[in-house]
């Protein structure tokens, strides 16, 4: 019995590797029923009329790409399928490439053109100050887009002078910058805001949901998979849920097994 408590960690790693590859060998589908906070975000965007403006701030870097990039893709599929005008930006320097790739790739699927159907403003340092500047005059905050084109007069920004004119905003974040979007953005300039965050940050969102400072949130890969289900375009998040769930079950089994052996050997002593 005691030998079982001293299993070589490499054996555990092998089991985890097998759990991850099971889905590749024997593909199976998992049902991911959407939660109410995900549905709230979906319903808000789905209720917008054609040519409404949705701002998406891609405030994350490659370290959290696996959780947040699927959210970005699902949101873009939803927006472009409804012919909404997307305004993309980032307050994280390392998020620039991720944001641009997502917007260009999904936009191309729907035949969307930069400057006309969407605009990518790129990165600007300053976080809270950038949000405040956008709240007063978006053309002062971003005089040019990521590609060096003048933002003034862009068809994609028609009718938008500041954050007050945004129909909906989403902050995809791996850090605490969502608070700046709430305090200096939503509260000051009165626009609806949703958040996409890593799974570990999910519990932090509930107080803001309760105070109605957020309309909803997507938490981790599961939140992204739920949104894909609602949009009807299952992509990377839905594919990632199966191996993730198998590994989670395996870890729980290891914990239960370890506790059982521990108490069993303890009684003998």
Q: What role is predicted for each listed range?
A:
Residues 63-119:
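Membrane-embedded segments
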Residues 101-128, 211-229:
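Structural recognition of alpha->loop->beta junctions
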Residues 115-203:
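Membrane-proximal low-complexity regions enriched in glycine and acidic/polar residues
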Residues 30-50:
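Alpha-helical transmembrane signal-anchor/signal-peptide segments
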Residues 3, 196-269:
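C-terminal functional extensions of proteins
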Residues 52-61:
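Acidic/histidine-rich, surface-exposed loop or edge segments in extracytoplasmic proteins
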Residues 1-7:
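N-terminal positive-inside, membrane-proximal cytosolic segments immediately preceding the first
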Residues 10-26:
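Hydrophobic membrane-insertion alpha-helices, especially the h-region
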């Amino acid at each position: 019995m005691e030998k079982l408590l001293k299993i070589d960690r490499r054996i555990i790693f092998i089991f985890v590797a097998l759990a991850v590859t099971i889905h590749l060998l024997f593909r199976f589908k998992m049902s991911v029923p959407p939660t109410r906070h995900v549905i709230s975000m979906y319903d808000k965007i789905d209720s917008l009329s054609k040519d409404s403006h949705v701002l998406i701030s891609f405030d994350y870097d490659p370290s959290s790409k696996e959780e947040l990039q699927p959210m970005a893709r699902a949101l873009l599929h939803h927006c472009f399928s409804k012919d909404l005008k997307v305004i993309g930006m980032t307050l994280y320097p390392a998020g620039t490439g991720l944001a641009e790739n997502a917007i260009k790739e999904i936009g191309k699927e729907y035949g969307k053109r930069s400057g006309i159907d969407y605009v990518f403003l790129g990165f600007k340092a300053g976080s809270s100050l950038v949000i405040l500047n956008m709240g007063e005059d978006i053309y002062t905050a971003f005089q040019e887009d990521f590609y060096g084109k003048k933002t003034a007069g862009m068809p994609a920004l028609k009718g938008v002078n500041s954050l007050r004119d945004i129909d909906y905003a989403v902050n995809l974040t791996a850090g605490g910058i969502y608070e700046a979007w709430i305090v200096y953005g939503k509260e000051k300039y009165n626009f609806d805001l949703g958040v996409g965050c890593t799974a570990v940050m999910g519990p932090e969102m509930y107080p803001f949901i309760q105070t109605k400072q957020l309309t909803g949130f997507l938490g981790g890969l599961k939140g992204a998979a739920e949104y894909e289900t609602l949009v009807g375009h299952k992509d990377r998040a839905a594919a990632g849920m199966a191996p993730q769930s198998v590994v989670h079950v395996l870890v729980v089994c290891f914990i239960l097994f370890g506790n059982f052996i521990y108490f069993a050997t303890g009684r003998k002593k």
